[in-house]
Amino acid sequence: MLRTIVVFAPIIAALAWVIFNIQKPAREQFNRDFLGKD
């Protein structure tokens, strides 16, 4: 169990960092396109 946490924690952290960095500009673009039409 502890070994699984040690193995997966950096992977999950890296995935979360990548997803966060992808979503931040995508969300700004989404707000500009979708909310801007109203």
Curated annotation (Swiss-Prot):
Coiled-coil segments: none
Transmembrane segments: 4-22
InterPro entries for the chain: PSII_PsbY (IPR009388)
Predominant place of localization: membrane
Keywords assigned: Membrane, Photosynthesis, Photosystem II, Thylakoid, Transmembrane, Transmembrane helix
Subcellular locations according to the entry: Cellular thylakoid membrane
Claim: Membrane is one of the keywords in the record: yes
GO molecular function terms listed in the Swiss-Prot or TrEMBL record: manganese ion binding
GO cellular component assignments: photosystem II; plasma membrane-derived thylakoid membrane
GO terms, biological process: photosynthesis
Assembly and interaction partners: PSII is composed of 1 copy each of membrane proteins PsbA, PsbB, PsbC, PsbD, PsbE, PsbF, PsbH, PsbI, PsbJ, PsbK, PsbL, PsbM, PsbT, PsbX, PsbY, Psb30/Ycf12, peripheral proteins PsbO, CyanoQ (PsbQ), PsbU, PsbV and a large number of cofactors. It forms dimeric complexes.
Function per UniProt: Loosely associated component of the core of photosystem II (PSII), it is not always seen in crystals. PSII is a light-driven water plastoquinone oxidoreductase, using light energy to abstract electrons from H(2)O, generating a proton gradient subsequently used for ATP formation.
Assigned protein family: Belongs to the PsbY family.
Stated name of the protein: Photosystem II reaction center protein Y
Native source organism of the sequence: Prochlorococcus marinus (strain AS9601)
